[in-house]
Amino acid sequence: MDYDCCFTKEKNWFRYRAAAIIIEDDCMLLVGNSNEDYLYSVGGGVHMNESSQDAVKREVFEETGVHYEIDRLAVVHENFFNENNGFLKNLECHEISFYYLMKPKGNQELFSNSYTRGGTKEEMYWIPISDLDKYKAFPTFLKSYLSEPKQEVTHIVTDERI
C-alpha cells in the first residue's frame, strides 16, 4: 500500500500535494463533489518515495481516465487554511502543492470514475477561464495566474484560515 506524504499532529494537518493545471479550449478542468460547495484542482497527495511529477500524472489519470503529459512546473503553492466540516474539521491545515501545467490534448473528452477518500463520486467540470471568478474554486490564485501565466516557476503563499 502506498502512503501519502501527509500527517496530523495534535490539531495540525500537513500534506504534500501534486496538482494539475489542465486547459483545453480556454477552459480549465476542475473537480467537485456533492459534499463540498466549491471546486478544486485535479490532483492529490504525493506518495512516499514518489516524485511530484509521477504523482501528478498518476492523479490526473486516476481522476480523469486520461493520460496527460507534463508541460512544466508552473506554481509552488504554500497554503494555510482550515475547514468547518469533513475530515479536516477543526484542524489547522498546511499544504504544499506543486502545480504542473499539462500539455493540451486538443479535446475535452474524459473517462472519469473518481471518488473522494470518503467514497463520494467526483464530477469533472470544464470552466471557461474567463468565468473562473464566478465560481468558488480553489486554489484562489487560479484566475489571476491564468490571466497572466508566467514562463518561470511562481511561488505563491496563501493564508485562508478563518
What residue spans do the PLM features occupy?
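Conserved Nudix-box catalytic region and its N-terminal flanking loop in Nudix hydrolases
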Residues: 24-66
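Short, charged/polar surface micro-motifs in flexible loops or helix N-caps
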Residues: 26-28, 36-37, 47, 76-82, ...
